[in-house]
Amino acid sequence: MTHRICGVDLGGTKIEAVVVDAEHKVRGKARIQTPTADGPGSVVEAIIEAITQAAADARVKPSELSGVGIGAPGAVDSETGVLTRAPNIPGFEQPYPLAETISKAVGCPVKLGNDVGVAVRGELELGAGRELQHFVGIWWGTGVGSGVVLNRKMWHGRGAAGELGHTVIQRGGLAEPSGMLGTMEAYAGRRNMETRAHAAVEAGRETNLFALMEQIGKKRLSSRVWQESLESGDELAAELVGEAIDAIAAAAANVVNILDVEAIILGGGLGSRFGQPVADRVAVAMQPYLFLPESSPPVMVAELGDLGGAIGASLLIGKQS
Amino acid sequence: MTHRICGVDLGGTKIEAVVVDAEHKVRGKARIQTPTADGPGSVVEAIIEAITQAAADARVKPSELSGVGIGAPGAVDSETGVLTRAPNIPGFEQPYPLAETISKAVGCPVKLGNDVGVAVRGELELGAGRELQHFVGIWWGTGVGSGVVLNRKMWHGRGAAGELGHTVIQRGGLAEPSGMLGTMEAYAGRRNMETRAHAAVEAGRETNLFALMEQIGKKRLSSRVWQESLESGDELAAELVGEAIDAIAAAAANVVNILDVEAIILGGGLGSRFGQPVADRVAVAMQPYLFLPESSPPVMVAELGDLGGAIGASLLIGKQS
């Protein structure tokens, strides 16, 4: 029987699904907007729809899949498949048995993992990290997630490792929504960058960020909006992206000082869109924060691109023997 | 034949040597002031003298030792036994074949390790970390060194891991002598605390720190001076120690956010002298910097005490079969 696995990347704005073969090659895909209605029901339906569409695109029935791996933002119990808490997904503020619910509907095994964790694992096994022994993945998007890979394994600690975005680089500095002050994410998370852009406009600064947002037809300052504004020479965009780069660089240098890893891999919505030019700026900005600047590790860009989260999620399902 | 190992802790102010038996029990010890004359010759002689005295105290000849392990501050090549650079030891600004030189003089094998690395390994195998799977040791002294233990092994990365003292917590903040700004050590290293105390006195602040230093007969604000000043209610000492605690807490919380380790072990001259009351203050100060304050790991005090560095160094010599 054909071996087909589905991987789903559940995001705050979209649900991305891929169906891959035994060699991890993408055979089918689908993308659906994440419903914003209250309650988990509509999100569950949308996930099932994305799986069904991706399976159809790969010419298999959902029930013929060897399994579905789902990467979800927030706290995940990978043993039980319960999405403990996902503040960015409407209706998932409370624990929800996501894997079990989807499994019953689709008719195949379902496993759940953290979205950044599975994306970093994707880079480890199939992407920029495939020849590295150790690295730190920094996923720069709405928030800034991270994954620590040591001796070619994800490091979990007591279960909650990888919160580089919430490390402090500026005591008493900017607040993030959680109330923590001066963390890397307070400067670099896209949501917080948008809050700062709003505040700047209210204070009288000029920018094309929000005009571009409307032109493109977005409700948020998406990665594309930031990229286009930056390329147009917008001063506020340049300033806020510059501050985000410095914050990411400080936190990345800290983790290099502590763990002396072989590389930093930059991914996520903003990281992947900005690509190597911005990764190079992060590398330069790391220099003053490194104890040994002469042995600064490379800052690489995630290779699996937009589908990386979904492809990484498919790795949650082991190959059948 | 009796199995006796010597461990040496080479410090900027003193050289501590112990001779231990196969069960790591201390059978002899010696302490010698670190010579301040230029050139490595006098320091090498002092190390040999410390080994000889500790061996005599344990009733063995130096040549009968199974080996000597030396923990040295600075960059160490543990393969070749070369002390690459030890800025705190007069005469060791250039690479020096320390293990080979001592081995020829003493007549037994000599191994070299980083001082904080061997002290943390001592805690891992014989001290506060003996039942932990993973922890970070923070050695609070003249500088602030650290050691990362993962799955009961020291983590070295590409060879230079463990520089938690040089991670940034306050971009653009206080300078440390290396020129790095706003690092934890800039606030918490004893040398930098002394610099700040001098500056405060020049700015008109009152303190008993320097009077106590002279009473005790020291040339530096030693750990004992800080402790006695703090206990006397000195306001400047309380303020600077408080700021050091907050800096250590911020960096410790960062490493917990990244690695989610089971514990922080606090050691070093100041850490060991201040003991559990200050470790408890570090734990409290970590709270606002933790992403998951409810699962804050314990902050423990190193158990091997003053001789921990020398005992840890003895572990560089494996047991003979």
What do these predicted ranges mean?
Chain A
Residues 130-188:
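Glycine-rich phosphate-binding loop of actin/hexokinase-like ATP-binding domains
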Residues 110-114:
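General beta-strand structural signal in soluble alpha/beta enzymes
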Residues 13-14, 118, 142-145:
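Conserved A3 ("GATE") glycine/threonine-rich loop of ANL adenylate-forming enzymes
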Residues 1-67, 77-82, 100-108, 122-132, ...:
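ATP-binding/phosphotransfer module of carbohydrate and carboxylate kinases, centering on a glycine-rich
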Residues 81-95:
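A charged helix-plus-loop insertion that forms the helical arch/lid used to bind
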